[in-house]
A protein has these predicted regions:
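Acidic/aromatic/glycine-rich contiguous surface patches that form carbohydrate-binding/processing clefts
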Residues: 194
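Extended intrinsically disordered or low-complexity regions, especially N/C-terminal cytosolic tails and loops
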Residues: 1-186, 198-273
Length: 273
């Protein structure tokens, strides 16, 4: 009844109730926002079926992007572990002298302990506690870092290390890479917690090199530009990610509005590598 009271057209009450049992009303109500007028009422002739399809589009879109971020995250782990292990040794990350002046080593060690405690039942953790007195090489401990922790770890390295990683691995500046890691941490968290991407404005506007296409809004498109720059395999980005992204958009193109995810008309050309 709440759906009908707002003016949405419900063609099948049974299907509507069934859907609401899967997606609770509070979560679903956020998808009403694009159809709300300034006075709080809603536009006429909007079907509940369209709301459902936008909801499903958002869900599938999160799936595509989450898989993409996972690929980026695994690559970042590998690169940070290899670099720091090569330059500072397997346990060098425990030495506060390798970090910059903003680094809070006590906080960092507490975060490491949290990582270990949260994974205390892992065979890897048990093995290193029993055999190596709880000393974890960088390439082991980093596997338990969250995306936010990886971003924090990079931001606290010495400037020379930051520059090398940004330039040699990601072909960008330190400022851009720091910004990008913060952005994908936020995006990853939204995807992981089933949060809405459609008609959503992100807090951070990613920093882009001067020669690049700069995002003009805080919608999803600006975040996907970041994924494009960080994705480790150019060929796979075009053949897999872009194919999946286009398929989801084409499936729901009659119900969604690209402007609500910040996509320009030439979005495919801008995102292709």
């Amino acid at each position: 009844e709440l759906i009908k009271e707002k003016g949405f057209i419900v063609n099948n009450d049974t299907e509507c109730i069934s859907f609401l049992k899967q997606a609770n009303y509070y979560r679903l109500s956020a998808y009403f926002l694009p159809f709300r007028k300034k006075n709080g009422t809603y536009f006429a002739d909007i079907s509940f079926n369209r709301i459902q399809r936008i909801y499903k589009f958002d869900s599938k879109l999160r799936g595509v992007l989450f898989n993409c971020i996972e690929r980026i995250e695994l690559h970042l782990r590998t690169q940070l572990a290899y670099y720091c292990g090569h330059v500072y040794g397997s346990l060098g990350y425990m030495d506060k002298s390798i970090y910059n002046k903003k680094h809070n080593h006590d906080k960092f060690r507490k975060l490491l302990n949290v990582c270990i405690e949260e994974n205390k039942n892992s065979l890897v953790v048990k093995h290193h506690k029993e055999k190596y007195d709880g000393k974890f090489p960088i390439w082991v401990i980093i596997e338990f870092f969250s995306m936010g922790m990886l971003s924090y770890f990079y931001a606290d390295l010495q400037s020379g290390d930051q520059k090398y990683i940004a330039k040699e691995i990601y072909d960008t500046s330190v400022a851009c890479l720091k910004s990008w890691l913060r952005c994908i941490t936020d995006l990853r968290n939204r995807c992981a917690h089933y949060s809405r991407l459609y008609y959503w404005s992100f807090t951070a506007l990613p920093k882009m090199p001067k020669e690049s296409v700069a995002p003009q809004n805080r919608k999803l498109f600006s975040q996907i530009l970041v994924l494009k720059r960080l994705y480790p395999d150019k060929k796979e980005w075009n053949s897999k990610v872009m194919t999946e992204l286009r398929a989801v958009i084409e499936e729901y193109e009659d119900d969604i509005s690209l402007k609500h995810i910040g996509f320009p008309q030439d979005w495919y050309e801008q995102l292709e590598r």
